[in-house]
Amino acid sequence: MEYRSLTLDDFLSRFQLLRPQINRETLNHRQAAVLIPIVRRPQPGLLLTQRSIHLRKHAGQVAFPGGAVDDTDASVIAAALREAEEEVAIPPSAVEVIGVLPPVDSVTGYQVTPVIGIIPPDLPYRASEDEVSAVFEMPLAQALHLGRYHPLDIYRRGDSHRVWLSWYEQYFVWGMTAGIIRELALQIGVKP
């Protein structure tokens, strides 16, 4: 697939035709969810945030809006939508959820479910000052280009863990966020 010519229709048809395989064990039982906001344009965008430097965990990192599932959430999808509204003012009613990717285990002990949603191009994003320092859009075709990600193997507590690294403009995209983007690319048939 030529990543430079990815249209929203291409993305949607590939995502819907190539369903994710969910078949692995997890050690993490605490649930979390992130919204993967795809901006509806002829050449779609991927909305990302940069977390506030004042946060205890993942300070300053590029991330998708999201967080822990709480008791008021009916599902992981509801949690992702609630967190997106809290962090960047995306109303849940503005998100067309098209599916989920297989959950990812975080190093902080959560099983994180990526929720894919299409959002309108004209939403007035408003970053929560407590949680988000920046909101930016990356062209989806660029984000899904696997050649932009570089592996780094980390050894922690006797285990090997691979993380992926990339830059977009002044933003360093790595860790779980980069891994989720790569999984989305593989899910729609982008070849490594």
From Swiss-Prot:
Enzyme class, UniProt record, top EC level: hydrolase
Keywords, ordered alphabetically: Hydrolase, Magnesium, Manganese, Metal-binding
Domain Nudix hydrolase: 29-160
InterPro entries per UniProt: CoAse, NUDIX_hydrolase-like_dom_sf, NUDIX_hydrolase_dom, NUDIX_hydrolase_NudL_CS, Nudix_NudL
Record Gene3D superfamilies: Nucleoside Triphosphate Pyrophosphohydrolase
Domain of life: Bacteria
Coiled coil segments of this chain: none
Record GO biological process: nucleoside diphosphate metabolic process
GO molecular function: coenzyme A diphosphatase activity; magnesium ion binding; manganese ion binding
Database matches in SUPFAM superfamilies: Nudix (SSF55811)
EC number: 3.6.1.-
Motif (Nudix box) on chain: 67-89
Positions annotated to bind Mg(2+): E83, E87
UniProt cofactor(s): Mn(2+); Mg(2+)
Pfam families: NUDIX
Family, per entry: Belongs to the Nudix hydrolase family. PCD1 subfamily.
Function: Probably mediates the hydrolysis of some nucleoside diphosphate derivatives.
Identification of the protein by name: Uncharacterized Nudix hydrolase NudL
